[in-house]
Amino acid sequence: MNSASISRLTSVIRTTSVRGFHDRSSVPRVVDDREKSSAKYNDAGYTFRYHQQGVDPLPRIPDCKVPVARPNYKVRDQWNDEAARFGQNDYIDLLGDGSVHPAQLQYHTPTWLRGFPGQHKANELIKLIHYRNLYDSKLKQNSPKRWHELRKRIKYLMMQHNYNKQDEIGRERNLGLWEEEPDYTYKDKSRRSFRDEIH
C-alpha cells in the first residue's frame, strides 16, 4: 500500500472513532437505542471501595480453612400435630351466641370507625361524610379550622365523584351502607347519605 492510501485509511479510522464518542446523529434511531444513549456510564474506571451486593462475591479471607458459620439444618415437619391444629379452637365461645357484632369488640379503634368498611370498599368521601355527621356540632364549636378543612375536603371529593367517578358512587350504594339494618352504635346510617347537603 502506498502512503496516500495509508493516510486516507488513518483519516477514515480517526473520523469514525471520533464519531463514536458522540451520541447525536442526524440519522433517526430506534427508541431502544435512544434510551440506551441517554444512560451514560459515569463510573468508568472507578474502583469501588465497598462491597456491592449482588455484584461482588461475598468477602472471604483467602486460604482460610474455617468453614462459614451457619445454623444446623433442621428437618421441619410442617404437618406435625401441633402445627396442623394451630388455632382450630380460636373461634369457640369468643363471641357468645352471636348477639354481639365483632366490630363492637374493636376497642382499640375510634368509635366512629368501628365496623366501618375499609378503603377498598368505602372510599375517603364516605368516611369523611360519616365523620362529619357524627361530630359536626363538636367540631364547629371546639375546632372550627378542622371543621372548615373537613368541609372543604368533602366538597372537593364530592365534585370529583360527581364528575369523574360516578360509577364508584353507584358501587358504594350497593354496599349496604345506606340500608336500614340493625344499628350497632358505631354507625349512624339514618343520618349518612350520598345526598347530604354541603354548605
Curated annotation (Swiss-Prot):
Keyword vocabulary terms for this entry: Mitochondrion, Ribonucleoprotein, Ribosomal protein, Transit peptide
GO biological process, one term: translation
InterPro entries linked to this entry: Ribosomal_mL51
GO MF annotation list: structural constituent of ribosome
Location of the protein in the cell: Mitochondrion
Protein's name according to its UniProt entry: Large ribosomal subunit protein mL51
Major subcellular site: mitochondrion
Cystine bridges: none
Presequence positions on this chain: 1-15
Family: Belongs to the mitochondrion-specific ribosomal protein mL51 family.
Quaternary structure annotation from Swiss-Prot or TrEMBL: Component of the mitochondrial ribosome large subunit (39S) which comprises a 16S rRNA and about 50 distinct proteins.
Pfam families listed in its UniProt record: MRP-L51
Source superkingdom: Eukaryota
GO cellular component: mitochondrial large ribosomal subunit
Species: Caenorhabditis briggsae
